[in-house]
Amino acid sequence: MHPLREIIKDKKLLSGIADLHGTPSYVYDKDRIKENVARLSNALSKNFENFHICYAIKSNSNPHLIRVMHESFPNIGGDCSSPGEIYAAELSGIDPSKCIYTGNYESQSDLIEALNKGCNINLDDITSLDRLKKVGLPERISFRMNPGFGGGSYSGIITGGRDAKFGIPAEKIVQAYRNAMDLGIKRFGLQCMCGSGNLDEKFFTEVLSAILSNAVRIEKELKINFEYISMGGGFGIPYQDDQIALNFDRMFKNLSEIYYETYSDKQSAPSLWLEPGKSIIADTGFIISRVTGLKESYKNFVGIDAGMETLMRPALYGAKHRMYKVGDHGNNEITVDFTGQICENTDRIATDRKFPTLSQGDLVAIMDAGAYGYSMSHNFNTRPRSAEILLDKSSFKEIRKRETIEDIFSLC
């Protein structure tokens, strides 16, 4: 059962949010955020001598949510890929020195911002170093390695392998560090991120093994010692009832055995860095949306006020999100497509979904929208973006106001 299923059954609570703040609205559960942070940090602390969590701010940059993570685990850092994400980290109370900055095809202005803020700069290519040296050099640097393979729940979120635009091929990675050494840099990290949404523990074993074998090769050839090794993120969550969540305790125990086979002196071993996003925030958030129309055509369509402008993942990746009727689930089911109000036929939140009978005005919940939900929402058809609400047991507060049409045109 979904961890927030009981909340979705509370029709009084969610109707109250909808009546006060309108629909569609993103709703996040504070307790679930804290549970996810604790589950990850506890598994790491039991198995690794030194580790650092950099929350992937791209997944959801709302500072109110990041502050909950920061309060739960004060040492948390940020995985940033733009100046805006550095700003979000600072706004949330995270010092940029605890953040890793990984751009790709970076502009000089982006590099200047990351450098001036004191982020741990992770470069995507050897040419990035050429751009960086024109504006300044940090004391420590890392490079993103592409190990030649990747994996993800959808092809569009595989970030390693021969088709990926990211990282330096493993066969060229030594030269990147050699170039950095020639510029006088003496402190180094190594980073790799191969894909997102993975639920197979063996995949992470394969990734870490590839990173470690290359780390040893680089260290021996160049006579350097890595201060940290980041295996990125990519830890998936179950988006469907038949999917099984990652067992962090078991997985990090297995990964630590591989890690300390390579670095047997735990005290001097590089710190393990992670860059999780979905595994912290995805299942904490859902969208409440109101049924606006019912159509019997060649198919049965349920029109709702949340569309691809609200949640882009189904249209972009073919992603599937669980949906529930708010309140009493009911027994009668029909097969329907859920569609928004956008003038594109790809505007489907769900397709051929068996669902309880609905009436106009009913509320539905679109689950697991906490990651890459609001952060990927947009204004197509000049639709204002949703409000965001933080739920703390039976109380709630608005943490982002609903955008207005006037807001959209305020910079024109």
What are these regions (language model features)?
Residues 33, 58, 82, 114, ...:
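Conserved, mostly hydrophobic/aromatic
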